[in-house]
């Protein structure tokens, strides 16, 4: 591993693995079939984004991840680099057409003028789409 540690995966808790999985597949992820862990009873799905995996874990029967039980802060946003302004525009349009909320339509932001859009996934997690 050169250059230090690399992010291997990020886990998101959800009440709807199937709905959240469909949203991230629309962003280009390759999804495993959702399955249920025999030991914990938690339903989960792994989404592959090239070198980083996004694990979706469905909360069932009042189960809460340890981070929530401890009152720890959560995720601020997930960021996805799409490669072009046209890709940001197209995906933002597709996300809106699918009924998901667009917080900020595509625009140039910040002093560097980075082209981005900010949307919400079905669970309300903030997702930033950039070039």
Predicted regions and their residues:
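Core segments of cupin and vicinal oxygen chelate
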Residues: 13-54, 60
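Vicinal oxygen chelate
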Residues: 1-3, 45-46, 92-131
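Short beta-strand/turn micro-motifs at beta-sheet edges
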Residues: 62-68
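Exposed loop/turn and edge beta-strand positions of beta-sandwich/beta-sheet ligand-binding modules
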Residues: 6, 41-43, 74, 113
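N-terminal beta-strand motif that seeds the catalytic metal site of vicinal oxygen chelate
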Residues: 1-21, 33, 75-80
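A generic structural micro-feature
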Residues: 2, 39, 69-72
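Short amphipathic alpha-helices within nucleic acid-binding modules
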Residues: 86-91
């Amino acid at each position: 591993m050169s250059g230090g540690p690399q992010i291997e995966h990020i886990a998101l808790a959800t009440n709807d693995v199937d709905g959240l999985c469909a949203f991230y597949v629309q962003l280009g992820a390759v999804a495993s079939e959702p399955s249920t862990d025999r030991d914990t009873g938690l339903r989960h799905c792994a989404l592959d984004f090239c070198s980083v995996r996004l694990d979706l874990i469905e909360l069932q029967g009042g189960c809460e991840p340890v981070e929530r039980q401890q009152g720890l802060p959560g995720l601020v946003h997930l960021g996805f680099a799409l490669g072009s302004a046209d890709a940001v525009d197209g995906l933002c349009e597709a996300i809106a057409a699918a009924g998901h909320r667009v917080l900020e339509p595509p625009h140039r932001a910040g002093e560097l003028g980075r082209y981005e859009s900010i949307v919400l996934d079905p669970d309300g997690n903030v997702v930033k789409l950039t070039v």
